[in-house]
Structures are given as C-alpha cells and as structure tokens.
From Swiss-Prot:
Gene3D superfamilies: Aldolase class I
Primary gene name: hisF
Role noted for this protein: IGPS catalyzes the conversion of PRFAR and glutamine to IGP, AICAR and glutamate. The HisF subunit catalyzes the cyclization activity that produces IGP and AICAR from PRFAR using the ammonia provided by the HisH subunit.
Entry similarity comment: Belongs to the HisA/HisF family.
Keyword terms of this UniProt record: Amino-acid biosynthesis, Cytoplasm, Histidine biosynthesis, Lyase
This protein's name: Imidazole glycerol phosphate synthase subunit HisF
GO molecular function terms attached to this record: imidazoleglycerol-phosphate synthase activity; lyase activity
Length: 257
C-alpha cells in the first residue's frame, strides 16, 4: 500500500506566504523558500505552492520562486496559480517543479489537461478543484474558479470524473467552506470525490487537529492531507502529526533520522 502523504501548502501573494479564512483576510506567514526548507527538513512528504494572486491579476506564477525552491529542497513540490499554457507548464517544470496545478485554466479550456498530460506525463498534472456546498444542499458541491470568486455552476463530482478522463494524475480538492477555519476537513466531500475517481485525492481546507488529519485519511479516504494554517501558526509540527498517525497504525513515511 502506498504511504499516505502530508503536504504543507504555501499560498503565495506578492512573493510572500499568506493565509486567510475562507480565501479572504490574508495575513503574512513568511518567506516561501525559507518555509519550504523548514517543512522539508521537518519531514514533509511534498510541498504545494499556490500563487493565489496570479489567476485574479492574470500574472504568471514566478519561475524564479520555483528555481530557488528547487535548489533548496529535496522533496517533490507542486506549483499552481495562473498557469494557462503549455509553455508556462514547460517553463515551471524546467525550473524545477515536479508537478503543476491547474484550476481556472482547466475549467476554461479542458483540452489543456489532455495536452499537458500527453506532453509531460499524467504524474505532472494536478487539477485543483475549489468546492463549495450548493446552497441548502448537504451532499452537492459546485466548482469555483478565480481564487474562489467565481461560481462555474459545474458539479464537483462530475468535474472530478472528467479531469481524470482527460489525463489528470491527481486532484487537489479544497473545501472553500472549511478553508483556514481549522474546524476539520469536509469528510463527506472528500470521500464522495475519492470514491468517484481512481486517482489520488489530496484533501484541503479545515485541518485543525491531529484527529482531523486521522479522520480525513480513514473516513475521508484521502491519499494525502494538505496542511496550511495549522503548521504556519505552529499549532502542530509535521513530526507530531506523523508520530500520531503511525501510532494509529496508518501507513506513513517516517521521518529520516
């Protein structure tokens, strides 16, 4: 069985790591490369960088950040935000990213998923899905784009199945209702999508405790857990999380001594 993964997420705006609640009220959380190094050394399995301003302001993700990170960390990392062309994907992968995350551009032009997966391999293509509960419906979610500002009307589960068909290697699934709240992952959302597809689902949005992370693996059936404010606020460390999960008999890659 493949080991479950812990993945710190670094939301980047104007060259700094930021974190907010429900995608707003952003606060500064530090330098991206410094934090990447810290989490890599602490035992993170992978990292995710999301340039949360790029899609909104139509700016490309900084290749420079990727290049500096690639020189500083040894674990795989994904970069996303404003990536809307094969040329940009190529530039980021050549700069040192292991994977790219597509969101708004994939909804606007689904062909970019199949084109990029054929050119670079499915293992390089992550599709980020920002999901919000449909009004007054507990078990249906809609896809949002433009940093969570625009409702596409697309059903999350149907879109997840579609991106898998087109060649996505992984889904980064964010509960916008839970983002930054530390109130727990949306287990129903995560499990529903994980059961609907055969590719790994990374759960994002709401981690606030050791139990939340355990639950998203066991009840939510996620392949990986994205962690942000929980780590940035130093509420827990990766080592503490891994020790807890290993003691709970989950298959986790232990920290190298």
């Amino acid at each position: 069985m493949v080991a479950l993964r812990l993945i710190p997420c670094l939301d980047v705006a104007n060259g700094r790591v930021v974190k907010g609640v429900n995608f707003v009220n952003l606060r500064d959380s530090g330098d991206p490369v410094e934090l990447a190094c810290r989490y890599s050394e602490a035992g993170a399995d992978e990292l995710v960088f999301l340039d949360i301003r790029a899609s909104v302001e139509n700016r490309k993700t900084l290749v420079d950040l990727v290049s500096r990170t690639a020189k500083s960390v040894k674990i795989p990392f994904t970069v996303g935000g404003g990536i809307n062309s094969i040329v940009t994907i190529n530039d980021l992968l050549r700069a040192g990213a292991d994977k790219v995350s597509l969101n708004s551009s994939a909804v606007k032009n689904p062909k970019i998923i199949s084109q990029s997966s054929k050119k670079f391999g499915t293992q390089c293509i992550v599709i980020a899905i920002d999901a919000r509960k449909k009004h007054n419906v507990s078990n249906e979610w809609e896809v949002y784009v433009k940093g969570g500002r625009e409702n596409t009307g697309l059903d999350v589960v149907n879109w997840a199945k579609k991106v898998e068909e087109l060649g996505a290697g992984e889904i980064l699934l964010t509960s916008m209702d839970g983002d930054g709240t530390q109130n727990g992952y949306d287990l129903l959302l995560t499990k529903t999508v994980a059961k609907a597809v055969n590719i790994p689902v990374i759960a994002s949005g709401g981690a606030g405790s050791l139990e939340d992370i355990f639950d998203v693996f066991t009840e939510g059936e996620a392949s990986a857990a994205l962690l942000a404010s929980l780590l940035h606020d130093k509420k827990l460390t990766i080592e503490e999380i891994k020790s807890f999960l290993i003691n709970k008999k989950l298959i986790i890659r232990p920290n190298e001594k």
